[in-house]
């Protein structure tokens, strides 16, 4: 049995990157049926993250700049992603097969 584990944040980033590539089929190619299933999984996964996290920070839209809807910058307190990545690399589970 193959054992593989990773932190959820890396799964989330993988899904965002996969969906980003779908926007550029001329660059990354079109997806097949398995890719569509994967895309649906990623969309649902990101939806669940948004619902579970339920960031209730108000977003204030102040108008348009250059034809695009503009919102005031929000203030975030973030975790140190570099430290998380380093910690995850040290603690990763190896294949125990």
Swiss-Prot record:
A GO MF annotation of the entry reads: oxidoreductase activity
Q: Domain comment, in the record's words?
A: The 2 HXXHC motifs are conserved in ustYa family proteins and might form active sites.
Major enzyme class: oxidoreductase
A biological process from GO:
mycotoxin biosynthetic process
Q: One Pfam annotation, family name?
A: UstYa
Residues spanned by motif HXXHC 2: 38-42
Q: Where is this motif: HXXHC 1?
A: 11-15
For this UniProt record, give its keywords in alphabetical order, as a comma-separated list.
Oxidoreductase, Virulence
Membrane-spanning ranges: none
Query: In UniProt terms, what function does this protein have?
Result: UstYa family oxidase, part of the gene cluster that mediates the biosynthesis of the secondary metabolite victorin, the molecular basis for Victoria blight of oats. The role of vicYc within the pathway has still to be determined. The pathway starts with the processing of the precursor vicA1 by several endopeptidases including kexin proteases as well as the cluster-specific S28 family peptidases vicPa and vicPb to produce 7 identical copies of the hexapeptide Gly-Leu-Lys-Leu-Ala-Phe.
Spell out the family assignment given in the record's similarity comment.
Answer: Belongs to the ustYa family.
**What are its E.C. numbers?**
1.-.-.-
Protein's recorded name: UstYa family oxidase VicYc
Species source reads Bipolaris victoriae (strain FI3) (Victoria blight of oats agent)
Q: Which pathway, per its entry?
A: Mycotoxin biosynthesis
């Amino acid at each position: 049995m193959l054992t593989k584990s990773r932190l959820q944040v890396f799964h989330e980033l993988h899904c965002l990157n996969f969906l980003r590539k779908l926007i550029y089929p001329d660059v990354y190619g079109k997806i097949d049926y398995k890719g569509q299933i994967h895309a649906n999984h990623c969309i649902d996964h990101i939806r669940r993250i948004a619902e579970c996290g339920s960031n209730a920070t108000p977003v204030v839209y102040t108008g348009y700049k250059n034809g695009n809807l503009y919102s005031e910058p929000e203030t975030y307190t973030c975790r140190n992603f570099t430290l998380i990545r380093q910690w995850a690399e040290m603690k990763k589970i190896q294949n125990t097969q």
